[in-house]
Amino acid sequence: MSSNMPASLANGRYQLGQLVGRGGMAEVRVALDTRLGRTVAIKIMRADLANDKIFLSRFRREAHSVAQMNNPNIVNIYDSGEETVMTDSGGTERLPYLVMEFVKGQTLRDVIKANGPLSQRDAEQVMLGVLNALEYSHHMGIV
């Protein structure tokens, strides 16, 4: 990720907060949407991948696809954009981002780490949510 991560995106609309997750393609930060006064999650693509047309296309396709969905088991996408930041060497980097619903809570990994294996009933509830989202995604032509 850029060593020059801005404090905000979209001309100050989204004030970036703490890092909440990192994956192979992007990192996710909690942020404040100053226009609507709500907490959001912002997925920011790794700067080194933003110039790769395949990764950038995949990132944009994800935003468009998920924005069309309306399911309680799939996070909502509110906005997307791209920021240009200065690098330490004086160049610029592109930072494409997605603004998403912030879902407060723990990851399944953290729950299992803290409490041990799920009971059969809890595992079934988790799987029902996942399967519901998968079925809906399939119905929408995503998978």
Residue locations for each model-derived region?
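Conserved short submotifs of the Hanks-type protein kinase catalytic core
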Residues: 86-107, 111
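Conserved N-lobe loop of protein kinases adjacent to the ATP-binding glycine-rich P-loop
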Residues: 30-39
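Protein kinase catalytic-loop region centered on the HRD/HxD motif
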Residues: 130-142
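Flexible N-lobe loop architecture of eukaryotic-like protein kinase catalytic domains
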Residues: 21, 61, 69-73
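Protein kinase glycine-rich loop
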Residues: 16-23, 28
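AlphaC helix of the eukaryotic protein kinase fold
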Residues: 46-68
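Activation segment signature within eukaryotic-like protein kinase domains
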Residues: 126-127
